[in-house]
Regions:
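Active-site-proximal loop/helix segment associated with metal-binding centers of metalloenzymes
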Residues: 93, 109-200
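Core catalytic region of metal-dependent phosphoesterases/phosphodiesterases
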Residues: 5, 10-106, 199, 203-211, ...
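Short loop/helix-cap segments at secondary-structure boundaries that form the rim of catalytic
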Residues: 104-106, 230-237
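Structural motif
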Residues: 4, 31-35, 183-187, 223
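Acidic, histidine-bearing metal-coordination/catalytic regions of metal-dependent phosphoesterases
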Residues: 1-4, 8-14, 131-134, 147
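Active-site-proximal beta-strand elements of phosphoester/diester hydrolases
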Residues: 1-9, 108-117, 185-187, 239-242
């Protein structure tokens, strides 16, 4: 079995048996995929351990693509392994980060993964903790109602968007299968879908790349998160947030 859910942001209540009773029939061979903003690797130190150990003891394997709210510095410290034909960061034996541009074969179906998204909750800026005016600017923003800001390498990471190498690897892997997959799992949506939503959404290099994938690839379903809603955009494109759906 393969299930997919949306943004978690470090809140894993939905995986408790009373909310997800299907897990009673699952084993570690079954997979739950989070479509980004996993948030379980946030502090990058022992403060994450209790949560990650709890996730490891769930009856299924938990895998996630990255979102725009992840501690990329911490994720990149985990060793890279091969899993079902693609690269992962092995956070725990059964808690896995599905790296960008990969194709995984799960129960004889191909899954293409391309995590990441551009943050839109940074209208008040990204603060540099080493800047001489950091404390002053932080205090001012903390006093401002509904301030939307982030702190570099503490609550925001430039790696939220893919690197040139990750785009190149995605193209190589798609070329190898003739751009034919069964499922696509991303955090943000292709440009044409992203612009249908909030006025805060805008095109960027990643959404434009995903638009190219939408136009070139052959696939059955595309599942994504990021926009905090549960909604079928059309018969092929599914936006997920709290909902858990079985795809295989």
């Amino acid at each position: 079995m393969v299930f997919v859910t949306g943004d978690l942001h470090g809140n894993f209540e939905r995986f408790k048996p009373k909310y997800f009773p299907e897990q009673a029939r699952m084993t570690k061979q079954d997979i739950m995929i989070c479509a980004g903003d996993f948030g379980g690797v946030w502090f990058g130190d022992s403060r994450d351990d209790e949560t990650l150990d709890w996730l490891e003891h769930l009856p299924f394997t938990l895998a996630f693509v990255c979102g725009n709210h992840e501690n990329y510095d911490a994720l990149e410290r985990y060793s890279v392994a091969e899993w079902h034909g693609g690269k992962v960061h092995r956070v725990r034996p059964h808690v896995l980060h599905l790296m960008r541009g990969q194709i995984f074969e799960l129960e004889s179906y191909r899954f293409f993964t391309m995590g990441g998204a551009k943050s839109h909750d940074i209208e008040d800026g990204i603060l540099e903790p080493d800047a001489p005016d950091f404390e002053r600017r932080l205090t001012m923003l903390q006093r401002k109602p509904r301030a939307r800001y982030r702190v570099n390498h503490i609550s925001w990471w430039a790696q939220e968007l893919p690197s040139d190498e990750e785009y190149a690897e995605a193209r190589r892997n798609l070329d190898a299968v003739g751009w034919a997959v069964d499922y696509i799992i991303t955090h943000c949506a292709p440009t044409s879908i992203a612009l249908m939503g909030s006025r805060h959404n805008e095109a960027d290099r990643l959404t434009d790349f995903l638009q190219e994938v939408r136009e070139r690839a052959k696939y059955h379903y595309w599942l994504f998160g990021h926009y905090h809603d549960n909604k079928a955009i059309d018969e092929k494109h599914i936006l997920l947030w709290e909902q858990i759906v079985r795809v295989i």
